[in-house]
């Protein structure tokens, strides 16, 4: 049986995670949050004092990537994420760990180590894959390819609200600077830079609600022969 694959790529804070989860629930597909994998690897390398030694200890870092002890659990509150048995669901969503992930994602050998791990998520009846290079690198054969973007300013405002909702302190200027720096790093890296696939459906969510974007996505996905 052919596995239907929907990819959602785009920059940090564009709403990919929320919409990918909604699509996965709507179509009853599996869900891959590839950003969580990079955040988990970045956090693990930081805990083992390897994040600042990526160049000199690359082989060791690659081994950590291949043996990463992670688990995803679906609960009433959403998806819980565990690293080495510890619940790190909120920890990996902090700006600090986002920076770790961006550093890790810039290393070709670490991206390759996570490649097969991501491919393994493609199981029947289908998969919604959320990330930066899902359509361009990991699942180029995807049935439906979406590139979700928004202005840096609107993404910063959303991120501040998200962090404040988690009880964390957040300053708009700091968040905006971080987003702009990550955009630059993600778009300029040598391997799998952030960009839409040539056949991607591009949505700018700057002035749209989650429900409006979701409807656009469902209409597009259905037009690509993925049926509910």
Curated annotation (Swiss-Prot):
The lineage of its organism: Bacteria, Pseudomonadati, Pseudomonadota, Gammaproteobacteria, Moraxellales. It catalyses: CMP + ATP = CDP + ADP; dCMP + ATP = dCDP + ADP. GO terms for molecular function: ATP binding; CMP kinase activity; dCMP kinase activity. It comes from Acinetobacter baumannii (strain SDF). SUPFAM superfamilies: P-loop containing nucleoside triphosphate hydrolases (SSF52540). It is found in: Cytoplasm. ATP binds at residues 10-18. Disulfide bonds: none annotated. This is Cytidylate kinase. It comes from the Bacteria. InterPro entries: Cytidylate_kin, Cytidylate_kinase_dom, P-loop_NTPase. Its EC number is 2.7.4.25. Gene3D superfamilies: P-loop containing nucleotide triphosphate hydrolases. The gene is cmk. One of its GO terms (biological process) is nucleobase-containing small molecule interconversion.
């Amino acid at each position: 049986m052919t596995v239907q694959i929907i990819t959602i790529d785009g920059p940090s804070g564009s709403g990919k995670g929320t919409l990918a989860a909604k699509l996965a629930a709507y179509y009853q597909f599996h869900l891959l949050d590839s950003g969580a994998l990079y955040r988990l690897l970045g956090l693990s390398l930081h805990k083992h004092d390897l994040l600042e030694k990526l160049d000199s200890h690359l082989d060791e870092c690659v081994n950590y990537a291949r043996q990463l002890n992670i688990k995803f659990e679906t609960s009433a509150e959403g998806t819980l994420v565990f690293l080495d048995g510890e619940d790190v669901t909120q920890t990996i969503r902090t700006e600090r760990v986002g920076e770790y992930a961006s550093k890790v994602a810039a290393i070709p050998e670490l991206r390759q180590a996570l490649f097969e791990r991501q491919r393994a998520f493609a199981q029947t009846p289908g998969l919604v894959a959320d990330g930066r290079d899902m359509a361009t690198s990991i699942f180029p054969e995807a049935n439906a390819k979406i590139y979700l973007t928004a202005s840096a300013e609107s993404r910063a405002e959303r991120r501040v609200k998200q962090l404040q909702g988690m009880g964390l302190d957040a300053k708009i200027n700091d968040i905006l600077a971080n987003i702009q720096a990550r955009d630059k790093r993600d778009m300029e890296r040598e391997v799998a830079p952030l960009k839409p696939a040539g056949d991607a459906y591009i949505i700018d969510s700057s002035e749209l609600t989650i429900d409006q974007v979701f409807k656009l996505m469902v209409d597009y996905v259905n037009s690509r022969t993925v049926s509910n």
